[in-house]
């Protein structure tokens, strides 16, 4: 009866799910790699001509079409087929009013510096994953650090995607209402961002399961040590009594 | 006339200024006439932006005014739970305190989301409308409303932190009392053992 009344805990559930994953180390490393790749592709949006698919916002005027990403902006005149791409901060004010305006919006409202911080955390997580194989003596410390950095990357990326979603949608509505231009929110950027954030969360959960199993092993070791120390104390007690009898 | 001072944003033309709040719009004309309505169909000085579209496409879809009503309800329930917990006999119940702390965290989160939505959406909209170079409409952010939103979030955060600290201190005190009781129980076999040994010696 005592076995059936064991308490339910979320960490126990995570550990049980972790036991069902085949090859959890390879699986978690693949998840981290996919999340990092999606993140890098999101950062490179609108920096080159071929990467405007993952744009954040597309603004059309009578004369130009501007695609804005997190760090880049692309400008294309209506009557020409060529497209000019630049970083956000390198865009000159004199070349085009709409491109400069949208670049200023992306830098001031979307806060892509937050995405740069996410890239730092995710790269640190990958470095820690590599260190698990280079220095396996400290695998517990590397795993805990991986859990921390990937959780931070997940939360910061979710915050960044929320900010980008709200601000880009509001900017698009403002552009449409004033009649300056026709603006449309880029769905692919949102999809890439949320997939990346979800995969960082999966990686964190898998490492939480690993950490739980390690803690369970440590608890078992401590209980065994306590049992042996109890036997040792008992032996000392018997020895003391024998000593007292002998003296008398 | 006080409701026109705490607007989310304002649109200014040469003829009039429109203050847009969560549920109300106020038009201040050039001859100092102030008219406040939930919704305006047209404004004499404003021709390029439709106020109906401002309300239906921006306020309802982006700012989400239902969220501030929701936050108000959550904070109201949390405040009522605090009032109920301060009554002499009911305050000792354990689950009321847990409910109050959960509600406090929930109200913090809802006000945070409300303030983020309002600030980010209105800032982006104001930047999109611009400073009147092209269509002679100047948009500006309502700073008083934003300051009020963030101050209320700060106060709710302070309340939540205080409640958490009080709960931690109370539970720690209970643990210390339990430890003292256990120690006083453990001391009894030691005394009996010493009495037994003295009996054996005699």
UniProtKB/Swiss-Prot annotation, chain A:
<keyword id="KW-0812">Transmembrane</keyword>
<feature type="transmembrane region" description="Helical">
    <location>
        <begin position="144"/>
        <end position="164"/>
    </location>
</feature>
<dbReference type="GO" id="GO:0070867">
    <property type="term" value="C:mating projection tip membrane"/>
</dbReference>
<comment type="similarity">
    <text>Belongs to the SUR7 family.</text>
</comment>
<keyword id="KW-1133">Transmembrane helix</keyword>
<keyword id="KW-0472">Membrane</keyword>
<feature type="transmembrane region" description="Helical">
    <location>
        <begin position="186"/>
        <end position="206"/>
    </location>
</feature>
<dbReference type="GO" id="GO:0043332">
    <property type="term" value="C:mating projection tip"/>
</dbReference>
<protein>
    <recommendedName>
        <fullName>Delayed minus-nitrogen induction protein 2</fullName>
    </recommendedName>
</protein>
<dbReference type="GO" id="GO:0032220">
    <property type="term" value="P:plasma membrane fusion involved in cytogamy"/>
</dbReference>
<dbReference type="GO" id="GO:0005783">
    <property type="term" value="C:endoplasmic reticulum"/>
</dbReference>
<feature type="transmembrane region" description="Helical">
    <location>
        <begin position="26"/>
        <end position="46"/>
    </location>
</feature>
<feature type="transmembrane region" description="Helical">
    <location>
        <begin position="110"/>
        <end position="130"/>
    </location>
</feature>
């Amino acid at each position: 009866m005592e076995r059936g009344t064991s308490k339910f805990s979320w960490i126990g559930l995570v550990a049980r799910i972790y036991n069902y994953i085949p090859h959890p180390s390879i699986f978690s490393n693949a998840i981290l790699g996919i999340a990092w790749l999606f993140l890098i592709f999101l950062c490179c949006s609108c920096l080159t001509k071929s990467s405007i698919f993952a744009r954040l916002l597309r603004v059309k005027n009578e004369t130009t079409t501007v695609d804005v990403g997190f760090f880049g902006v692309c400008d294309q005149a209506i009557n020409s087929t060529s497209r000019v791409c630049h970083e956000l901060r390198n865009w000159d004010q004199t070349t085009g009013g709409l491109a400069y305006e949208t670049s200023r919006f992306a830098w001031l409202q979307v806060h892509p510096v937050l995405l740069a911080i996410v890239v730092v955390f995710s790269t640190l997580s990958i470095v820690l994953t590599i260190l698990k194989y280079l220095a396996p003596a400290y695998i517990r410390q590397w795993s805990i650090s991986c859990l921390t950095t990937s959780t931070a990357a997940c939360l910061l990326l979710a915050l960044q995607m929320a900010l980008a979603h709200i601000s880009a949608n509001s900017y698009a509505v403002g552009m449409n209402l004033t009649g300056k231009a026709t603006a449309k929110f880029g769905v692919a950027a949102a999809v890439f961002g949320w997939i990346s954030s979800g995969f960082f969360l999966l990686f964190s959960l898998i490492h939480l399961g690993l950490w739980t199993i390690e803690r369970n092993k440590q608890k078992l070791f401590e209980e065994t040590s306590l049992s042996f120390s109890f036997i040792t104390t008992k032996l000392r007690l018997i020895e003391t009594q024998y000593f007292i009898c002998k003296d008398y | 006339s006080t409701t026109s001072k705490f607007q989310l944003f304002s649109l200014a033309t040469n003829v009039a200024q429109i203050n847009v709040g969560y549920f109300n719009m106020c038009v201040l004309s050039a001859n100092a006439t102030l008219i406040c309505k939930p919704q305006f169909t047209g404004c004499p000085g404003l021709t390029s932006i439709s106020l109906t579209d401002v309300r239906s496409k921006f306020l309802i879809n982006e700012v989400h005014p239902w969220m501030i009503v929701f936050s108000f309800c959550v904070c109201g329930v949390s405040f009522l739970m605090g009032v109920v917990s301060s009554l002499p006999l009911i305050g000792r119940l354990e689950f009321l305190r847990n409910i109050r702390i959960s509600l406090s965290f929930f109200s913090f989160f809802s006000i945070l989301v409300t303030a983020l939505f309002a600030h980010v959406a209105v800032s982006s909209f104001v930047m999109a409308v611009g400073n009147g170079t092209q269509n002679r409409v100047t948009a500006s952010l309502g700073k008083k409303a934003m300051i009020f939103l963030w101050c209320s979030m700060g106060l709710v955060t302070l309340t939540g932190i205080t409640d958490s600290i009080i709960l931690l201190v109370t539970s720690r005190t209970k643990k210390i009392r339990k430890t003292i009781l256990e120690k006083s129980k453990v001391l009894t076999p030691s005394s009996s053992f010493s009495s037994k040994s003295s009996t054996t010696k005699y």
